[in-house]
Amino acid sequence: MKDMISDIKSKKPLVHHITNYVTVNDCANVTLAIGGAPVMADAIEEVEDMVGIASALVINIGTLNSVKVKSMIMAGQKANELGIPVIFDPVGCGATAYRREVARLLMGKIHMRVIRGNLSEIMALAEENIHMKGVDAGSENISQVNDLLKNYAKQWKTILAVTGAVDKITDGQRLTEIENGCKEMGTVTGTGCMCTSLVGTFVAAAQQDAYDATVEAIMTMGIAGEISWKQNGNKGLGHFHMGIIDEIGKMNINILKEWGRIHEI
């Protein structure tokens, strides 16, 4: 395991977010907490200039409108042109036809270096993009799910980070499982979005090692949640929520090594 957190703190990479207004403050704060520099600009008049000075672009479709979609496409294509990694969070993409249409549009126009979502979101992407029908998102056949995820990563030429009770990261060849985190993280709005922002920050600082950067980012979020719940769970969800950001700010390679539960498949 590499000490990517120290690299982030020394480089202070600028991470450009076009994200949703429900969780934008938390996304900015976790980026700052781990050592990055967030900017949350979505005006179509400036996104190309902003992404041009960034080290990564995070696109999150949690709250959509037609103007923001145009900004996402413009920023994403500029990032691709400049070799800046794009991290995509297809929030709720299976919930409505509009979300599915936008996710499909973005995937067709922008190369995503990393896609971070839960299993149902990834399955919704797969149905639209590679026409694999009838996949049970709740399947207990772990081997089948792992094979599907590897196939999706190959098809999309991306690193796929699927978060849940057991997090799975694959580039189509390797597959890493992480068993950190706690179920209580689902009681706080935005932990998935925060996780995606961490992925963007880690990848921004380690662009040539995006796979390991993604793994360490997912571990960081899970471990921060575990520690915060242990320390703050009896104080209420507000303390738990803020505690996650506190623990991200205190995270280091030694904590990752001590708390990390990770294995290769």
Can you say where each PLM-predicted feature lies in the sequence?
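Short, well-structured alpha-helical segments that form the helix of a local strand-helix-strand
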Residues: 148-153, 210-225, 244
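Short, small-residue alpha-helix embedded
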Residues: 124, 189-219
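Glycine/small-residue-rich loop that forms an oxyanion/phosphate-binding "nest" at active or ligand-binding sites
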Residues: 68-117
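Active-site cofactor/substrate anionic-group-binding motifs, chiefly glycine-
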Residues: 30, 34-83, 88
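Glycine-rich phosphate/adenosyl-contacting loop at the front of the ribokinase-like
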Residues: 1-40
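Short pre-catalytic strand/loop immediately N-terminal to key active-site residues, enriched for Gly-Thr
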Residues: 178-189
